[in-house]
Amino acid sequence: MKQLTILGSTGSIGCSTLDVVRHNPEHFRVVALVAGKNVTRMVEQCLEFSPRYAVMDDEASAKLLKTMLQQQGSRTEVLSGQQAACDMAALEDVDQVMAAIVGAAGLLPTLAAIRAGKTILLANKESLVTCGRLFMDAVKQSKAQLLPVDSEHNAIFQSLPQPIQHNLGYADLEQNGVVSILLTGSGGPFRETPLRDLATMTPDQACRHPNWSMGRKISVDSATMMNKGLEYIEARWLFNASASQMEVLIHPQSVIHSMVRYQDGSVLAQLGEPDMRTPIAHTMAWPNRVNSGVKPLDFCKLSALTFAAPDYDRYPCLKLAMEAFEQGQAATTALNAANEITVAAFLAQQIRFTDIAALNLSVLEKMDMREPQCVDDVLSVDANAREVARKEVMRLAS
């Protein structure tokens, strides 16, 4: 029986994780749930899964949760704040920590889990985008095991040989017969939109993803392919891959989730329905397998699988991310922070779709790119980039 802390339990990854627990009550027990401000959903989760602890981001939400749980006779202990979240990630009897808090808020709790030597089911993109070197160093020191949840990285992980799986971030790809990693992406809803029309695309149009169901911010990142750019950065860290060992491919059907090319000419791929419960269940049960609740892939119903190289004129954010990796962690952190601000501005209809990439570049050009030495340095770069991005948005929107 694996004991689990879920960081970000009320978000889409958190809910999918709990669904895997629901399908496998004999394999997993929820010890702690950590969330932001969604009290209603947290109440439902606490009543169904009876965790020992529930943590809300702020005191007001925690107070409300406590009252509501007491009314229902729940014995779950309610806490609040970042330190409590970090404590839950490092609890002695917890085996696995699902790191699914979105954004910079997820950094310290994820790092706490790494330092405690846990098995970390990594769904928080920002961890490696902003703290790749710091986190991978901590993984090595504490002998923690990282298991990637993101569907693409999970597909790559499943397609890699065991020596690499057990030494993630440090194993030599070439020594293990790997030539390159093929990262696939759907290309988003504007894959075939004429370039001249991109400026007029609306938030609602950007959020209509053809294959995956996901939140609005990530949907926009899919439309700009910034999500693939961030995944590229993550993959470089996770799999110890050089630029020449990475290939990015557009694959509109999202059936092949990513591939690994080997020296002998073999290419191994992981296929499946586009449902996050598959990679989540894989990481939770690794090295075994459990029922994820996902319906089997029906090959007879598949249309043709197609592939194309990404067009950087259509997806300038992808190119920005690839270039930022070469500049270092200050650049990747600044890009990620700027992108959160610009995407929020686009969703609020303050700027146009094409302004997202232009403003992200503008922020990078204005930042001091000294390499961060600790999480506080990273958070400082993050805060500065957000400030610069806000000013850029205001300049453009006024």
Curated annotation (Swiss-Prot):
It catalyses: 2-C-methyl-D-erythritol 4-phosphate + NADP(+) = 1-deoxy-D-xylulose 5-phosphate + NADPH + H(+). The lineage of its organism: Bacteria, Pseudomonadati, Pseudomonadota, Gammaproteobacteria, Enterobacterales. The gene is dxr. Catalyzes the NADPH-dependent rearrangement and reduction of 1-deoxy-D-xylulose-5-phosphate (DXP) to 2-C-methyl-D-erythritol 4-phosphate (MEP). NADPH binds at T10, G11, S12, I13, G36, K37, N38, N124, E126, G215. HAMAP family: DXP_reductoisom. Pfam families: DXP_redisom_C (PF08436), DXP_reductoisom (PF02670), DXPR_C (PF13288). This is 1-deoxy-D-xylulose 5-phosphate reductoisomerase. 1-deoxy-D-xylulose 5-phosphate binds at K125, S151, E152, S186, H209, S222, N227, K228, E231. Changing E231K: No effect on KM for substrate. Reduces activity by over 99.9%. It is an enzyme of class 1 (oxidoreductase). Optimum temperature is 40-60 degrees Celsius. One of its GO terms (cellular component) is Dxr protein complex. SUPFAM superfamilies: 1-deoxy-D-xylulose-5-phosphate reductoisomerase, C-terminal domain, Glyceraldehyde-3-phosphate dehydrogenase-like, C-terminal domain, NAD(P)-binding Rossmann-fold domains. Disulfide bonds: none annotated. Optimum pH is 7.0-8.5. Divalent cation. Prefers Mg(2+), Mn(2+) or Co(2+). Changing H209Q: Increase in KM for substrate. Reduces activity 5000-fold. The keyword Ligase does not apply. Its cofactor is Mg(2+); Mn(2+); Co(2+). Pathway: Isoprenoid biosynthesis; isopentenyl diphosphate biosynthesis via DXP pathway; isopentenyl diphosphate from 1-deoxy-D-xylulose 5-phosphate: step 1/6. One of its GO terms (biological process) is isopentenyl diphosphate biosynthetic process, methylerythritol 4-phosphate pathway. Its EC number is 1.1.1.267. InterPro entries: DXP_reductoisomerase, DXP_reductoisomerase_C, DXP_reductoisomerase_N, DXPR_C, DXPR_C_sf, NAD(P)-bd_dom_sf. Homodimer. One of its GO terms (molecular function) is NADPH binding. Belongs to the DXR family.
